[in-house]
Amino acid sequence: MSKSTAEIRQAFLDFFHSKGHQVVSSSTLVPNNDPTLLFTNAGMNQFKDVFLGLDKRAYSRATTSQRCVRAGGKHNDLENVGYTARHHTFFEMLGNFSFGDYFKHDAINFAWELLTSEQWFNLPKEKLWVTVYETDDEAYNIWANEVGVPHERIIRIGDNKGGAFASDNFWQMGDTGPCGPCSEIFFDHGDHIWGGPPGSAEEDGDRYIEIWNIVFMQFNRQSDGTMLPLPKPSVDTGMGLERIAAVLQHVNSNYEIDLFRDLIAAVADVTGATDLSSKSLRVIADHIRSCAFLISDGVIPSNENRGYVLRRIIRRAIRHGNMLGAKETFFYKLVAPLIAVMGPAAAELKQQQAMVEQVLKTEEEQFARTLERGLALLDDELSKLTGDTLDGETAFRLYDTYGFPVDLTADVCRERNLKVDEAGFEQAMEAQRRRARESSGFGADYNSLIRVDSASQFSGYDHVQQHATVTALFRNGEAVDEIHAGEEAVVVLNRTPFYGESGGQVGDKGELKNATATFSVTDTQKYGQAIGHVGILTTGTLRVNHSVEALVDVVRRNRIRLNHSATHLLHAALRNVLGEHVAQKGSLVNDKYLRFDFSHFEAMKPEQIRLVEDLVNEQIRRNMPVQTEVMELDAAKEKGAMALFGEKYDDQVRVLTMGDFSTELCGGTHASRTGDIGLFRILTESGSNLPGCTILRNLAIAGFSAFGSRKLSKRASEPSGRKFEPSVARQRCFSNGP
């Protein structure tokens, strides 16, 4: 009996766990602190800093099942979804990774054992072909001499993309940085399907399908193109779950695996479709996966960047539902079936089900108002065509007036063997695109970040003053041995009481002093495992290995502590008043105020704002102890502390509890008891005015600042009289900025 998709996912993770790999949870679809990516599109994304040497992990082997989206930007499969057997906007990438641990020998043998062993996937060895980079004799010999793959099924692939090292079998992170040859494994579906082996003229056929790519990171590419050997070579592999499921379930299309069969049946049920072979069913089944998980990870339909890609996918699905005869809103009804088929991989989505359904329903209702009129206009324009191309001006008018993304218009044209003048459309969109580029952070130079090999010990939970040693100095981003009076710099210490900005909490300010020098700290940031003190040397000279006294601005730190603890109470109160679907989407905690962004269906009513504020102050009056405990991440989850997407967690996490009201993961500084906060007041509540947007923002103050301040206008005139029973609000602090 064939394994289910869920069983295949688990078997992959179990296999590599048995080989000493740490099983790491999927990261968010919105890349964490990586402005170079629109969406997470590969398993290695969450380990990018590790491969670049900017971050270190407690483990040297890892395995994941990473949720990925390829739509928009450089990696865009959207237009092909529904027309091919293997293109998806959303997929899961199974991967195993070595960070300077094992290399080619083990990576290749692990892959072969998993694929061919009777205990695991038990694929026929004679059905497997492999490719290696043309000059990678080491990998070739391992496949041929150790694994025993016949020479005729090992294919060398050279530079087939027009330049040195430009090859299907040579992977590069960017123009510079880690890179290396790769070895791909293909499955032969048999001669009843057209296609040839990789490297042949018929390689684009469906007979030989790539199922696994094993990347050997062994070089560091320089700006002049030279390749320097990495001191510790690493391994990054990726295998599409849907592809290997198709192979193991003996079907030729990803859309025939058990997961998609169930989803397609659900789509047919909610749309009333009877032809289960319709490509529209495949489109919708694919799109509900990317849309639901993107919304769950905090992306909201909009007209910019990630939000616009999401809107395009939603509207393409709605249009295909229209083609199937759906008369009412249907797309949001697929969230529940999706959760059912995804199983444990949808645990976070299940927690946000109500919000995801509401966002999808609102977006569908909005688009439904213009869909029919837009389609009528498009039909009219296409009927007038004398050639085979719709002009870009009309495509832009459909976008601007009726909300038709250009790929939706192209989809309609494609079904009639017509094209869209996309160059003309882009010309009409030039002003909007320029503004989007100017507001976008994508494409930042990752190599400009300060790199620190050493680590700093943080002592700020218990101390605000600490004797320490300077371990590194940076001026203008470059490492130096000394700095002089008047120079701005970043100072790294071996230990420090200064809190580095993270979790929404700003960095500390203060001074670093010794007998001959004073450094004014205006900010504190994290650089990998090190803590950097940003500021200016006001007197003297400071050198590496100098001793200093690190002095935190205590008054400012205390105000931040109170605001941070109040933020946790606010989150708990929001979940109590509005519902458990509320999830934190961003925060800012400084010495003046706290700002808290969260998900909800609609703007808060005045009486709800009053209830939240009153509930927070009730918890302050209870004067509950604020306690912290360091434990394993899994133990923290069992304790009730929810770890959501968007934050990187170490194996050991800090759990913060406030009586019976709040339990969460947080590395920030806090009050000792809730009563220390004194008073809490909400100043403003706002949200985006984009239709379908459900991210709200509270601006609030706590402590001495709250006394004598004016309350939020437009308040409910009378208390509601609602009585609350304290409940554990499972939450955590995000590092999202403003």
Curated annotation (Swiss-Prot):
Q: EC number(s) per UniProt?
A: 6.1.1.7
Q: Does the record's keyword annotation contain Secreted?
A: no
Record's keyword terms, sorted: Aminoacyl-tRNA synthetase, ATP-binding, Cytoplasm, Ligase, Metal-binding, Nucleotide-binding, Protein biosynthesis, RNA-binding, tRNA-binding, Zinc
Supply the PROSITE patterns for this chain: AA_TRNA_LIGASE_II_ALA
Q: What does this protein's record comment on cofactor binding?
A: Binds 1 zinc ion per subunit.
The record's listing under SUPFAM superfamilies reads: Class II aaRS and biotin synthetases (SSF55681), Putative anticodon-binding domain of alanyl-tRNA synthetase (AlaRS) (SSF101353), ThrRS/AlaRS common domain (SSF55186), Translation proteins (SSF50447)
GO CC terms: cytosol
The record's Gene Ontology biological-process terms are: alanyl-tRNA aminoacylation; negative regulation of DNA-templated transcription
Reading the lineage from the top rank, the first entry is Bacteria
Q: Name one GO molecular function term.
A: ATP binding
Which annotated residues bind Zn(2+)?
H564, H568, C666, H670
Q: Note the InterPro entries from the entry.
A: aa-tRNA-synth_II/BPL/LPL, Ala-tRNA-lgiase_IIc, Ala-tRNA-ligase_IIc_anticod-bd, Ala-tRNA-synth_IIc_core, Ala-tRNA-synth_IIc_N, Ala-tRNA_ligase, Ala_tRNA_ligase_euk/bac, Thr/Ala-tRNA-synth_IIc_edit
* Localization (cell): Cytoplasm
Its UniProt entry gives the catalysed reaction(s) as: tRNA(Ala) + L-alanine + ATP = L-alanyl-tRNA(Ala) + AMP + diphosphate
Which EC class is the enzyme in?
ligase
Kindly list the cofactors needed.
Zn(2+)
Q: Which Pfam families match?
A: tRNA-synt_2c, tRNA_SAD
Subunit structure, briefly? Homotetramer.
Q: Which HAMAP family has this protein been placed in?
A: Ala_tRNA_synth_B (MF_00036_B)
Function according to Swiss-Prot or TrEMBL: Catalyzes the attachment of alanine to tRNA(Ala) in a two-step reaction: alanine is first activated by ATP to form Ala-AMP and then transferred to the acceptor end of tRNA(Ala). Also edits incorrectly charged Ser-tRNA(Ala) and Gly-tRNA(Ala) via its editing domain.
Give the family this protein belongs to, as stated in its UniProt record.
Belongs to the class-II aminoacyl-tRNA synthetase family.
NCBIfam families registered for this protein in UniProt? alaS
- Share the domain note from the entry: Consists of two domains; the N-terminal catalytic domain and the editing domain; the C-terminal C-Ala domain is replaced by an unrelated sequence in this strain. The editing domain removes incorrectly charged amino acids.
What is the protein name stated in its UniProt record?
Alanine--tRNA ligase
Q: Which organism is it from?
A: Yersinia pestis bv. Antiqua (strain Antiqua)
